[in-house]
């Protein structure tokens, strides 16, 4: 999901990647909860396969600050990439979405939210993370708070930060 969201929000225009990102986001949003609840559900796993593949294609366009920060945290603290991304995603959405109202509306529509505003989209992501019992802070996965300035400085040098 993070791959699709970040790729879609990269400012460069790339209709093929944008289409892949939106369709990937839609599929992951639909099938991830089912796949988590029913790990042997072949339809859910297939939906996740296609959604993840589309999101992977989409990020040929670039990624953003979630990945820039996650790369640095993972390298220094050996955290799991997807989990680190999931924890960081809502905070970066709060930073990025005010600058991309049309992108927010498009993503919210793709996941069938009635309210297509920024806060509704972030609330939806947070609800999914809560459902999956994802920790709400990096300190809960062993990342100390005293590293914030160092990680931020390193993250701004990451190639993903350049396409945020």
Show the residue positions of the predicted features:
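Alpha-helix N-cap/helix-start motif at coil-to-helix transitions, marked by capping-box chemistry
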Residues: 15-26, 60, 83, 98, ...
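Amphipathic alpha-helical interaction segments
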Residues: 19-23, 27, 47-50, 68-71, ...
């Amino acid at each position: 999901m993070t791959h699709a969201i970040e790729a879609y929000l990269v400012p460069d225009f790339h209709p093929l990647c944008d289409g892949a990102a939106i369709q990937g986001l839609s599929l992951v949003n639909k099938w991830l909860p089912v796949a988590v609840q029913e790990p042997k559900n072949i339809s859910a796993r297939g939906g996740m396969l296609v959604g993840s593949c589309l999101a992977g294609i989409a990020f040929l366009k670039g990624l953003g600050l979630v990945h820039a920060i996650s790369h640095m945290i993972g390298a220094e603290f050996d955290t799991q990439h997807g989990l680190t991304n999931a924890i960081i995603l809502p905070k970066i959405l709060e930073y990025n979405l005010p600058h991309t109202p049309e992108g927010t509306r498009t993503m919210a529509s793709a996941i069938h939210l009635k309210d297509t505003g920024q806060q509704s989209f972030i609330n939806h992501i947070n609800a999914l993370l809560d459902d999956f019992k994802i920790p709400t802070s990096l300190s809960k996965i062993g990342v100390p708070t005293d590293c914030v300035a160092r990680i931020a400085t390193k993250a701004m040098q990451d190639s993903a930060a350049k396409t945020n």
